[in-house]
Amino acid sequence: MPIEQKYFSLFSNLFKRLTTNNNNNNYLKMAPPNFETFKVKKLSDKAIIPQRGSKGAAGYDLSSAHELVVPAHGKALAMTDLQIAIPDGTYGRIAPRSGLAWKNFIDCGAGVIDSDYRGNVGVVLFNHSDVDFKVAVGDRVAQLIFERIVTPEPLEVDEIDETQRGAGGFGSTGVKVQN
């Protein structure tokens, strides 16, 4: 066997031994985050476990566990009666359901669930229409999307590098496509 193959085989086996979850050494015992499941606890019998509407859906539907009315041009809080353990390395983003936004002018806000939050998940609903919007028990009001995050430490500096854009914001680049 050529020397390159011997070294490759040796390092490959060593890497496998160091990175397996059942190794008996203290060098590298880090279990990867589990993105296959997430824990959910029902806080009432009216709570509904989040589900995806289709195999390709990005979000898990969140349902209201209580009846409520979102007043015209107002807001309301829809409680799901769920505790959700968001996997480490991610956060849960509460996003609008496209059908509610398009058909009923219902949007949602304040949509971040941190991985260490363990309270009842609530959905802030905004009604941008001229009529009150009724929510029944079990109605799907939002969707939960898991997103990976990076949490670097802030570093205070005296200067920040300049860019071509600079401080321009809020439409400073225009609406036309740049050629």
Curated annotation (Swiss-Prot):
GO terms for cellular component: mitochondrion. DUTP binds at residues 97-99, 111-114, 122, 165, 170-171. It comes from the Eukaryota. SUPFAM superfamilies: dUTPase-like. It catalyses: dUTP + H2O = dUMP + diphosphate + H(+). InterPro entries: dUTPase (IPR008181), dUTPase-like (IPR029054), dUTPase-like_sf (IPR036157), dUTPase_trimeric (IPR033704). One of its GO terms (molecular function) is magnesium ion binding. Residues 1-41 form a transit peptide. GO terms for biological process: dUMP biosynthetic process; dUTP catabolic process; pyrimidine deoxyribonucleoside triphosphate catabolic process. Its EC number is 3.6.1.23. Optimum temperature is 60 degrees Celsius. Keywords: Hydrolase, Magnesium, Metal-binding, Mitochondrion, Nucleotide metabolism, Transit peptide. Homotrimer. NCBIfam families: dut, PRK00601.1. Belongs to the dUTPase family. This is Deoxyuridine 5'-triphosphate nucleotidohydrolase, mitochondrial. The gene is dut.
